[in-house]
């Protein structure tokens, strides 16, 4: 790809410059798509918490908090864009340890809500709930990218595969213990995508797939009863319409009720559980219709395309893998989240990036986008 070109530039002694001219490399399309998707998320937060329920607007309103998190995300985006992304490569292991500490802390003092009330997924700080597993997704993209970038010359070695699996193991197990099946699947999918795009041996990727299959009994044993029921009813939600199949049935009803143009913002009538997070696309389809739902999917397609363009244009392995990892992570979450709503995949609790309510998710995504913009600004290229 572009790795040999990067090595040639370094041998010639050329170093990237991050001056004002570098801003012509800023990917404004990428940021625009992310902002538009976040705007859809704000609209859904308003509809779910203010418009349809007529709640008073207070500091504790999810809509107001979504705006606050949006402002914080913009600041994080600007800061991470300004910093040289290369420090992340040397700081990846401290980040990994911080990630482990946060996940252990979640198990120790975490709280759960709703159906998953026995799960320890959120840590309450100053009245705000933080889901550190959302941060773990982005941190692990950085860690995987740094690990594989350092081993590009031996990427086909089985020891490289074994090593990165050992890196995945601790956070994956800690997330599964919460239990958070959705995030554990995202971590595995992200790593698999990165291994494939970094040129790992297909033989060893097949071995990795076999390992994942072999781990299914362990994963099943760690799942809560309601999670197992969700999987067992995916083929026929009407087998338990008031229990495990209720969410899928309501989501499909909402999508069908929206029609082509939707019922209008705040006019949704179908009751959906976790309507601001896991099933937000169902609410969006009901209120904004098929047109609105498709527009969101088109925006995601364009966003992922720009991420892949960033990866293609990167001139060194770490930057390339960062972009590819984030593209893989977002793609997997979108496919599974929409699949949950229309009943094609089990309900696993995976949010819709940028659109689902959640401060930790939005801020971590903003940090990821800012880091990718930093790679664009500092792209190694000769001066003509």
Where are these regions (language model features)?
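A juxtamembrane structural motif centered on a specific transmembrane helix
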Residues: 1-17, 338-384
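Transmembrane helix boundary and interhelical junction motifs in multipass membrane proteins
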Residues: 180-185, 261-264, 275-277, 290-294, ...
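Long extracytoplasmic/lumenal interhelical loops at the membrane interface
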Residues: 255-291, 314, 318
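N-terminal transmembrane signal-anchor/hairpin module of polytopic inner-membrane proteins
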Residues: 1-45, 67
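Hydrophobic alpha-helical transmembrane segments of multi-pass inner membrane proteins, especially
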Residues: 31-47, 52-244, 282-342, 367-371
